[in-house]
């Protein structure tokens, strides 16, 4: 019997045991004081209630999207590394990927891939998202550690229960969508059955898309791989296909809630136009048990979860598959992630609250590349990229919240965390080309005889203050000291034998080759941040936020020349470079501005209001005085929206400045500025909703500022793709979606 399914049976038995001890009755419906305070003190992040993100208002975006990270695009300070069609990486104030703590239904998920093709947000379908909370770099220590850029919490829809006088509930909804560019199509369903004390939910979603087209040709027409021809507009390796299933069970008593969520994901294909490989299979199984109890003195919250991923990469149709007699380059990763969180909060007085908690995470990963063909390049043995990789986290934290007066609030927190890492012995495809793994002088041998165990003792501190003299004006400010340890790939990728193997370890999308560094130290970030918030909806219908920030990072992990850390890497003639990693110094600063204003309201024209936001961030390596990689240039978004009867109509204008402050060591590409126009409309009716519109209405050609280097076709394994082409954005695309409730 499958190991995970044995675990599921055990958990179901635990649920049955809890059920027998529950006192069934109506659960208290009011939010806890802790939840109310947290939403108040979050700096430039909140329990999102903006259109297209939370609850019913997110329906329009979720109904046409396949990429959950895209739900965050309108959050101030947020940008996206565009990668595969399902796997964008969020970046908050210039810090992305593992520098952010990303939780899905409370689970701290980890990307099990040398190219980070399966980031945490790819494990939940947009149609299953109930709410999102974004907390920036001065987030409370209880929101998660081992990160320096902030926390993103994505939760599926909350468990539904019937009222005592309502009887049983059976309801749900189903949806379909189509996008003209890439012929993207998909369907989803969500069904609920509930009594006053029991809740059951099932959700499923499927999505499929072909390669998308840019607004104009950015390369030559022709043969991209054997049997595959791409046009000059076609972005190779941008197709995808996915399937997601989720089951939820919940029982509640008068002061208790127990939830069990099971998840299954299968992605048979996801192309990556900025990677040399493509995802040819990703299967994930998740089990998540959550318990919460309200007591006289406060609340207890406990969670235990397990997630396992089987991930495969190779070349899809647009990339060359045969190299001599070698059929592709199969790469596999197996990740096993187990975690537990225990948290309790005590109401000490009407003024003070104390939150104490502990967190445990145990992660195991193997990354290997099976032999291909009979030549010396990829045979006859299995290439061991990371063997028995271990990354264990154990943390304790405490927070003290004080409502000093009706106008002043503070939250102080400290977190102590130990991160222990290790890995086993490695080996190349053969000893002649890659070195004898038992020798003390070969590349794998030096790694195998090194001390590979890492023990990091990390400290996080946060201090947040809020001044709100009235309901229309508030000032939030704070300081945070946050720490992140390197991930397994940053420390334990060892191979610098040739360009081919270095190309395969790249989680940046820049086309370069990378080798890790056993000597990496944790990153330490100090952040100062503030938000000025003014609103007056009664008199003038206006809201305004201004939020500056500054972050200094000690031991920032950045790309360096191999020679600077004592490694010898092959030179290249294709414009890309082979690099390693080292601790540097960096700083990031910027400002977010957002506003909303009601312009007019009448019976004939409905409500018309304007929204807008401007985001600026600058990131710099202060040792080299060059730009940090993938920093979003100055950008703004403005929209004019009309709401009349059941119709909502939106005209949106997005403007992005040119990107020229780039990472020189990586030969990061500059991009030009651009402006896009989007037109959207939706119609709500009692049993559902219809959305339709046009993205990139004027069919403007542009390069994605955070899209990386174009590697979507051809002989990508070695040096067959020249440097210098950026990944273009999507050309004009019409869409339509429908959601029906039952």
Where are these regions (language model features)?
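N-terminal periplasmic "start-of-domain" segments of outer-membrane beta-barrel proteins
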Residues: 37-71, 89-91, 97
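Short acidic/polar hinge/loop motifs at secondary-structure boundaries
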Residues: 109-138
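Outer-membrane beta-barrel translocator/receptor signature
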Residues: 127-131, 136, 141-218, 239-243
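Outer-membrane beta-barrel signature, preferentially recognizing the C-terminal barrel domain
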Residues: 135, 277-296, 329-337, 385-393, ...
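C-terminal beta-signal and adjacent terminal beta-strands/loops
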Residues: 215, 483-484, 559-561, 657-661, ...
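Flexible loop and strand-edge segments within Gram-negative outer membrane beta-barrel domains
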Residues: 238-242, 255-300, 308-337, 375, ...
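Gram-negative outer-membrane beta-barrel transporters
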Residues: 403-410, 418-419, 537-538, 542-562, ...
């Amino acid at each position: 019997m499958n190991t995970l399914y044995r675990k599921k049976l055990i958990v179901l038995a635990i649920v049955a045991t809890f059920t027998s001890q529950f006192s069934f009755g109506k659960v208290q419906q009011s939010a806890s004081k802790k939840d109310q305070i947290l939403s108040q003190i979050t700096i430039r992040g909140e329990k999102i209630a903006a259109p297209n993100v939370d609850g019913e208002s997110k329906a329009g975006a979720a109904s046409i999207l396949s990429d959950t990270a895209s739900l965050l695009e309108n959050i101030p300070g947020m940008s996206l590394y565009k990668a595969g069609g399902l796997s964008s990486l969020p970046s908050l104030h210039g810090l992305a990927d593992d520098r952010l703590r990303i939780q899905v239904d409370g689970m701290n998920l980890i990307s099990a891939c040398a190219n980070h093709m399966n980031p945490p947000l790819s494990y939940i379908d947009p149609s299953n998202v109930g709410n999102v909370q974004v907390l920036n770099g001065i987030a409370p220590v209880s929101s998660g550690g081992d990160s320096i850029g902030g926390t993103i919490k994505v939760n599926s829809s909350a468990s539904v229960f019937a009222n005592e006088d309502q009887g049983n509930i059976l309801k749900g909804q189903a949806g379909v969508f189509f996008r003209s560019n890439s012929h993207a199509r998909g369907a989803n369903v969500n069904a609920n059955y509930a009594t006053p004390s029991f809740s059951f939910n099932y959700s499923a979603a499927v999505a499929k898309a072909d390669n998308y087209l840019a607004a104009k040709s950015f390369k030559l027409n022709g043969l991209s791989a054997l049997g595959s021809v791409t046009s000059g507009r076609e972005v190779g390796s941008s197709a995808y296909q996915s399937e997601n299933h989720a089951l939820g069970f919940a029982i509640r008593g008068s002061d208790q809630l127990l939830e069990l969520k099971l998840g299954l994901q299968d992605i048979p294909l996801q192309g990556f136009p900025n990677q040399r490989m493509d995802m040819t299979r990703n299967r994930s199984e998740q089990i998540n048990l959550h318990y919460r109890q309200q007591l006289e003195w406060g609340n207890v919250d406990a969670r235990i979860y397990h997630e396992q991923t089987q991930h495969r990469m190779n070349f899809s149709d647009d990339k060359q598959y045969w190299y001599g007699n070698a059929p592709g380059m199969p790469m596999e990763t197996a990740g096993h992630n187990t975690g537990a969180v225990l948290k309790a909060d005590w109401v000490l007085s009407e003024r003070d609250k104390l939150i104490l908690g502990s967190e445990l995470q145990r992660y195991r990963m193997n990354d290997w590349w099976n032999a291909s063909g009979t030549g010396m390049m990829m045979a006859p043995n299995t290439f061991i990229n990371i063997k028995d990789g271990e990354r264990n986290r154990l943390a304790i934290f405490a927070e003290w919240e004080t409502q000093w007066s009706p106008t002043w609030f503070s939250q102080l927190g400290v977190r102590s965390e130990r991160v222990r890492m290790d890995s086993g012995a490695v080996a190349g495809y053969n000893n002649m080309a890659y070195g004898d793994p038992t020798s003390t002088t070969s590349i794998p041998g030096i790694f195998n005889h090194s001390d590979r165990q890492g023990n990091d003792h990390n400290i996080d501190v946060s201090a947040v203050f809020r001044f709100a003299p009235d309901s229309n004006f508030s000032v939030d400010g704070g300081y945070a000291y946050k720490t992140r340890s390197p991930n397994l790939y940053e420390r334990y990728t060892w191979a610098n034998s040739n360009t081919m193997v270095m190309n395969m370890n790249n989680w940046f999308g820049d086309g370069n080759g990378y080798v890790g560094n056993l000597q990496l130290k944790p990153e330490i970030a100090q952040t100062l941040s503030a938000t000025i918030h003014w609103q007056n909806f009664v008199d003038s219908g206006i809201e305004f936020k201004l939020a500056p920030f500054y972050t200094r990072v000690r031991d920032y992990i950045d790309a360096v020349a191999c020679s600077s850390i004592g490694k010898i890497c092959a030179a290249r003639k294709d414009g890309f470079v082979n690099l390693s990693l080292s601790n540097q110094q960096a700083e990031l600063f910027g400002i977010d501005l957002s506003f909303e204003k009601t312009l007019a309201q009448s019976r004939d024209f409905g409500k018309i209001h304007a929204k807008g936001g401007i985001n600026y961030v600058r990131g710099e390596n202060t040792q080299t005085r060059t730009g940090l990689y993938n920093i979003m240039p100055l950008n703004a978004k403005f929209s004019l929206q009309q709401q009349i009867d059941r119709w909502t109509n939106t005209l949106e204008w997005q403007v992005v400045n040119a990107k020229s402050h780039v990472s020189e060591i990586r030969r990061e590409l500059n991009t030009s500025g651009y402006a896009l126009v989007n037109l959207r409309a939706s119609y709500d009716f009692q049993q559902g909703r219809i959305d339709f519109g046009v993205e990139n209405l004027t069919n403007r050609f542009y390069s994605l500022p955070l899209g990386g280097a174009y590697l979507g076709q051809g002989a990508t394994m070695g040096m067959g793709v020249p440097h210098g082409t950026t990944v273009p954005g999507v050309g004009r695309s019409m869409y339509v979606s429908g959601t029906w409730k039952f």
